[in-house]
């Protein structure tokens, strides 16, 4: 596990190839200026950026191209590692998830709670197909959807001037659902942006007054850190390595305005074997959990969504008797949400995978 590299970046970004306002060059420059290692662009119902060769390394930034499959009356997903999304927006979730799987792709539920705000021409259906086995994970924190809750025409300027004052963190019901689902199978949790670098007014009017939430600004907020083997700096190998790590849940989320989460670790050990976020290990034998934060915080270890242990500082260690459960970590700074790990699951009957001996 110690040879993994922390790759931090932005997930769920829109370009001019759908309804974003900026081209790929601008997005990549913003990612580099914000100190990101990667950016994941997921335009609505198109893979044009991939077709035109944008996936891979550009100016030191790894660009991943996916597609936000966006039916008008059902939930959306971010689909990765696919080559064709034509017609999927007219399909039901079971149909398009099957198409993604048949192409060897993976899917993550986007903004699972949906949203409807008439002032901003926003009408997104919530996700209903939680029992479907063909999705790999879900956005647990979406920056723009967090910000827009409570925003309307009368207070919009205040929300734009001071967006950080209106960010509250993941919705509790989304975290509760995530913890519940993770008890039966791996469900990867992502931090996402859903950023368009939009122009005001948001409604489809013939004139535009002001660009709000430019990408560089938003790229310094909710980020997903993905733990990957040292990159080779070759396009296909590093893209595949990144997507594989994401699918395995080798990732955590930080809110960078409170501090850079680079260096965060959440691991488990059992019988001389080490386990990483996204792993499962057998129940019934002692397990040791270790947490390391890059700066002091309130650290909370949760089991099935309930606090198991909390500590202030940069480290937490906890030993259990191997009780089944989906274990994860939250960290807060000044009572504000900062870090969210993915789960390490202890399951009855779980087969031991190939783990690294210490």
What are these regions (language model features)?
Residues 1-6, 184-189, 193-358:
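C-terminal functional module detector
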